[in-house]
């Protein structure tokens, strides 16, 4: 019974959000670790943290930074809170005020990446970093691109917001 409810919840939120809570593989996490910027001026936000697999990498790289994670699907959010001892914001991050963010990390489907570009990036301060993997931003050129050493050579993209 419980397994059915858990599966049903994950399926519901996958259909609603357009992407399931897919764990980031070890090899993609290694590429992310290698491309993360050393200097981040504000706090770190992970949009759509899923099962929380990037949290240890972000905590290790930025031990003095506030790390804010967002996930709307309840089952992965509860797992992440229990496993990593972090409060997960269970809200629509497109309604967030990321004003003093120094780094945004996200793995979202292409339609959501378009919304990030259209709605979220204009709110970010100049110099803020944006890291994505698998799916790039359509209208921006990354500062750096790295390919994971996995079967798919998964691309990891690093962007930086420029002054208007």
Describe the function of each predicted region.
Residues 1-39:
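S-adenosyl-L-methionine
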Residues 40-50:
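Conserved class I S-adenosyl-L-methionine
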Residues 52-56:
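Glycine-rich SAM-binding Motif I of class I
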Residues 66-71:
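Conserved SAM-binding motif I beta-strand of class I
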Residues 80:
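Conserved SAM-binding loop
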Residues 84-93:
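Conserved SAM-binding strand-loop segment of SAM-dependent methyltransferases
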Residues 101-115:
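A short SAM/SAH-binding and catalytic strip from SAM-dependent methyltransferases
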Residues 112-164:
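C-terminal substrate-binding/active-site "lid" region of AdoMet-derived donor-dependent transferases
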């Amino acid at each position: 019974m419980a397994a059915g409810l858990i599966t049903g919840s994950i399926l519901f939120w996958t259909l609603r959000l357009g992407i399931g809570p897919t764990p980031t593989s070890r090899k993609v996490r290694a590429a992310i670790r290698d491309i993360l910027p050393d200097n981040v001026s504000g706090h770190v936000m992970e949009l759509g943290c899923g099962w929380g697999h990037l949290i240890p990498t972000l905590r290790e790289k930025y031990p003095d930074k506030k790390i804010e994670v967002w996930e709307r699907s309840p089952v992965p959010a509860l797992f992440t809170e229990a496993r990593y001892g972090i409060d997960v914001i269970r809200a629509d991050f497109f309604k967030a005020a990321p004003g003093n963010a120094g780094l945004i990390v996200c793995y979202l489907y292409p339609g959501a990446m378009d919304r990030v570009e259209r709605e979220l990036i204009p709110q970010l301060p100049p110099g803020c970093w944006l890291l994505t993997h698998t799916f790039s931003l359509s209208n921006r050129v990354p500062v750096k691109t790295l390919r994971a050493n996995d079967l798919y050579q998964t691309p990891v993209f690093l962007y930086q917001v420029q002054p208007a």
